[in-house]
Amino acid sequence: MLTIYNTLSKAKETFKPLDGNKVRMYVCGMTVYDYCHLGHGRSMVAFDLVTRWLRKSGYDLTYVRNITDIDDKIINRANENGETFDALTARMIDAMHEDERRLNILPPDQEPRATDHIAGMHAMIQTLIDKGYAYAPGNGDVYYRVGKFVGYGKLSRKKIEDLRIGARIEVDEAKQDPLDFVLWKGVKPGEPSWESPWGPGRPGWHIECSVMSTCCLGESFDIHGGGSDLEFPHHENEIAQSEAATGKQYANAWMHCGMIRINGEKMSKSLNNFFTIRDVLEKYHPEVVRYLLVASHYRSAINYSEDSLRDAKGALERFYHALRGLPRVAAKGGEAFVERFSMAMNDDFGTPEACAVLFDLVREINRLRDSDLEAAAGLAGRLRELGDVLGVLQLEADDFLRAGAEGKVDAAEVEGLIQARLQARTDKNWAESDRIRDQLTAMGVVLEDSKGATTWRLAD
């Protein structure tokens, strides 16, 4: 039975979909003004993992992740570049999809864009005005009346009184309350705009997600996800808007993934420790980066460092070494490992424990490979099956272990030297065998002798 930590209740809860076996999940996606950074990658991989496990568990999942394609940052970057906002967002969306493909992230079922839902935003804003939850002061803006929504703060546990006392609030004479937030922004010179009942302008960030989620999934749905940095104010404001407009509970469960830290510090441009996904993939195999992101629990912060990446690479090498040399057959045996893996994943997607099961499975494969090849191969199939839930271990073992060899060594030359060494060993010419091994070592090639075969990989 699956349990999920619900940020709304601050507790693990048994997961019960609203509609039988059907699950509807919405995740806040990218604001596409720049290349995706590792924090985006963390969120994308975390909810890809959730998607894979829900489907593996037999749920009929509809996964929606939005694209914010109009925003202050987008407008500013487009102006800096001397291009239109939609030209910028088109490039960045293509780049995001390429990053996802390389990290083996499954595409969402729907990927709505904010600019395609302007009419829906007008409708929800008008509903909020009609119900007294929003007001138009006459300057082209429309604001949400925070004080009217009784449940404000229920997600973040923040109190309106404390927010008023503790916040550094900019004076805005158009607001009735300093905590009120914008639903519709009146047009400014040089900015893209859309016609509306309140004059030309563009939507505020928070209303975009309320409209896209309810348009795609209905007024109430099962899971709403995103990074922990979105809990307040973005997700708090989504709840306030949506529940005031519909009179219904917005999302049943709220899931938030942890942040990325760089060598123990928060990742930020100001600290000059900011990495895009493509920066990291220049140095590390995509599966290494993905494993780093799934091996920690999704709610935990991840420390990104050279050491952590080396650890991730080492773990994958152990897995692929176990798979190497075994025929690809259907998963067979290892039911106890499957049960332990499932228990871990059903406990709020407990990937650290799930990964520990994979290591135990590797030990069993290695124990059997010289005595019972058929059993070892069946367990290797099981390892790939469970690895697929994490989005790893689907490559050919040699392809992973030799990744990066292109341009560094000539594979044909290496294979020729290995064959010459095998012949020398057959002839009991140990001096020649050692000489060839030394030559390969000097080339950065590591040989691994096993029963009846020699394989190779590049040294770290």
From Swiss-Prot:
Molecular-function GO terms, alphabetical: ATP binding; cysteine-tRNA ligase activity; zinc ion binding
| InterPro entries in the cross-refs | Cys-tRNA-ligase (IPR015803), Cys-tRNA-synt_Ia_DALR (IPR015273), Cys-tRNA/MSH_ligase (IPR024909), CysS_C (IPR056411), Rossmann-like_a/b/a_fold (IPR014729), tRNA-synt_1_cat_dom (IPR032678), tRNAsynth_Ia_anticodon-bd (IPR009080)
The UniProt annotation places ATP binding at: K269
> Record's Gene Ontology CC terms?
cytosol
Chain location of the short sequence motif 'KMSKS' region per the record: 266-270
Top-rank EC class of the record's enzyme:
ligase
Query: Motif 'HIGH' region: where?
Result: 30-40
Superkingdom field: Bacteria
* Cofactor(s) recorded in Swiss-Prot or TrEMBL: Zn(2+)
For biological process, the GO terms are: cysteinyl-tRNA aminoacylation
State the UniProt keywords alphabetically: Aminoacyl-tRNA synthetase, ATP-binding, Cytoplasm, Ligase, Metal-binding, Nucleotide-binding, Protein biosynthesis, Zinc
Cofactor binding note: Binds 1 zinc ion per subunit.
Where, subcellularly, is it found? Cytoplasm
Q: Which residues bind Zn(2+)?
A: C28, C209, H234, E238
Task: Tell me which CDD domains the record gives.
Answer: Anticodon_Ia_Cys, CysRS_core
So what does this thing catalyse? tRNA(Cys) + L-cysteine + ATP = L-cysteinyl-tRNA(Cys) + AMP + diphosphate
Q: Keyword Zinc on this protein?
A: yes
Q: How does it assemble?
A: Monomer.
Please give the NCBIfam families that the UniProt record associates with this protein.
Answer: cysS
Annotated family: Belongs to the class-I aminoacyl-tRNA synthetase family.
Q: What is this protein called?
A: Cysteine--tRNA ligase
